């Protein structure tokens, strides 16, 4: 494992957002959803593609808090311009479990 400096870590903006929309993304190469995530007044709403269809249904995602990287460059994924990277962990079968705060925190709160 490569070590990084504290300065490297602090450059990554991991923020809390609330999923306000989730819909299938049929144009994606692998099964995915298009998520709309609200990061509060400072950052607003951003879109992301998330390969989480094995574990979550769209209706179960709306209203959930998630942790996302918000300072990566935007990335074109098929017809979608992804504006953040929603984070998660893969289980033994490769299914993604979302990284979520275990308490209610303000939208846009930064991981410290």
Regions found by a protein language model. Give the residues of each.
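Phosphate-backbone binding interfaces of nucleic-acid-interacting proteins
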Residues: 1-112
């Amino acid at each position: 494992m490569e070590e990084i400096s504290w300065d490297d870590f602090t450059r990554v903006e991991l923020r809390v957002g609330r999923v306000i929309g989730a819909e299938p993304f049929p144009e994606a190469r692998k099964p995915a959803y298009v998520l709309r995530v609200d990061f509060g007044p400072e950052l607003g709403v951003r879109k992301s593609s998330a390969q989480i269809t094995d574990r979550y249904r769209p209706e179960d995602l709306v209203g959930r808090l998630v942790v996302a990287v918000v300072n990566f460059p935007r990335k074109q994924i098929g017809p979608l311009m992804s504006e953040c990277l929603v984070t998660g962990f893969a289980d033994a079968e490769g299914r993604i479990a979302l990284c979520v705060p275990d308490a209610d925190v303000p939208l846009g709160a930064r991981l410290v």
